[in-house]
Amino acid sequence: MAAHSTLGVKVYTCWESSAGVKPSSGFTLFSDEITNIPTFDNAPEGIDVTPLSELKSIRRIPGLKDNGDDFAMTGNYNDTDMTTWAGLVTTAATNIPLGKHLWLMITIPGITKAYFISGTPVAMGLPELSVNSAVQGDYHLTPYMDGGWDTKASYVSA
């Protein structure tokens, strides 16, 4: 079994056309300039179900997963990506009250499935700026649902 590289990883976006239904087509490439995608591998919280008769250890069952407050992809800032993200944030003002979320589809070359995350895009701020550095910053998404690994959806652009 061969290992896989991060070379060629891509992030696609698509809005739900029906509230609560992950799109299966219509994804478009967000950016070729993403430099870091954070982990999104959260274990469920443990629910204590220890009976009073237990004398040795606490018993737990899986509870809800906390997807956190922020999913921040880092990228090289450029006008195209900044405009695209700002458009997603603007669309959120209309779609989120209707229960329609933005979906990210993250593809890794050589992996048959893609990873899906839905949420609300957040307006960009000013990134850190320092001498002799690339202008990079974060594209923030407030997670709504962890779609997990699933069949790749069709996309409009590669």
Listing of model-derived features with the role each one plays in the protein:
Residues 105-151:
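Short beta-strand and beta-hairpin "edge-sheet" elements
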Residues 83-118:
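Short, acidic/charged, Gly/Pro-enriched secondary-structure junctions
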Residues 2-74, 120-135:
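Solvent-exposed edge beta-strands and adjacent loop segments
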Residues 153-158:
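Intrinsically disordered, low-complexity terminal/linker regions enriched in Pro/Ser/Gly
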Residues 71, 75, 100-102, 137-139:
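Residue-level detection of beta-strand scaffold positions
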Residues 77-80, 146-148:
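Acidic glycine-/aspartate-rich tracts in secreted/extracellular proteins
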Residues 44, 80-83:
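Short, charged helix-to-loop "capping" segments that act as catalytic/coupling loops
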